[in-house]
Amino acid sequence: TGDIATGVLAEIVVDAVLQVADDDRRVGRDDVRVFTRTGASAAATELVRGVVFESEPANDNMPRSVEDATVAVLDMKLDVRSGEIDTEYTITSVDQLDAALSAEDAERRAIAETLSAAGVDVVFASKKISDPVAAHLADAGILAFSNVTESEAHAFARATGARRLGTLDDVEASDLGTAASVRVERHGGDDVTFLEGSDDSRTVTLYVRGSTDHVVDEAERAIDDALGVTVAAYEDGEIVPGAGAVEVAIADRLRSGANAVTGRKSLAVEAFADAVDAIPRTLAENAGLDPIDALVDLRAEHDAGTTAGLISEGQTGIIADPIEYGVLDPAAVKREAVESATEASTMIVRIDDVIASN
């Protein structure tokens, strides 16, 4: 993960999961967003309660920071409404042209006035905001963003409590959301916008920083993996020792059970146990240990009633209690792995013929 401490990264991930979890310990994975940007030390990585995204205001004269914002999330184009039927008008004088242009400008101004009258400070539109409408919004002191993505619009609504509106007819206070602040900052030569949600915001963003693209990419991959296992552990509520300790216990129970199975079935059970042993064997090799000696030592510790696994310590590995070293796995992940392996093995064993291709 580059120059960011693993402990700091882990703490940020846990905080993110806890902030978006509901009362039933369910976590919407889409509610935890990851946004990356180079140009700063990885130590600047932070958790934002809200949404971080790359976008610039629809007009340069708009404010770049709004506190205690009232937010509208719109699934509509902000411009003069076009009719369902193409209509052609014949203009025969300058006065008629001026009147037509004035009518269009009045309609565009009305969009800004409607939003302003509703108390809106910030607008996120999933479709285009025309330049004239953006200018009127700027005159009204409204910060607006055009052409936001579908995932961003969903996140804005979750972070602020706003409803996504397809029309400005009869906008009510309950349709709008709130944000502690919305601000546009310059990071790495680009405009980066921060929407800080309220206390009940259901969306958070892990803003990952790094000095190079490589550092950022490594941190993002680590965060994605960490989020997956953290969500699994939190939702299931059960964890087990990692570092191969569980696999050693499973293999031991399988071999003990194989003695009670008669005939050729016992060979299948033994083979399954050998396959499970592949995990601690691989961990031993990666830690620079002899895999056979490591397996013998692990089995001895297990027979003695001790929880033991393969822990990376400096340039080599040691056999120790993974719980003491904080090496834990979600029970749900282990359970799913065993079930999937059992299903795959059963399917292969049931094959009684092979058809060679060509």
Where are the regions a protein language model picked out?
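Flexible loop/turn segments at secondary-structure boundaries
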Residues: 80-83, 130-134, 213-216, 248, ...
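Non-catalytic terminal/interface segments that mediate subunit docking, oligomerization
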Residues: 62-96, 200-202, 206-213, 217-225, ...
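Extended amphipathic alpha-helical scaffolds
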Residues: 1-205
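Short, mixed-charge, low-aromatic patches
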Residues: 89-92, 109-114, 179, 206-208, ...
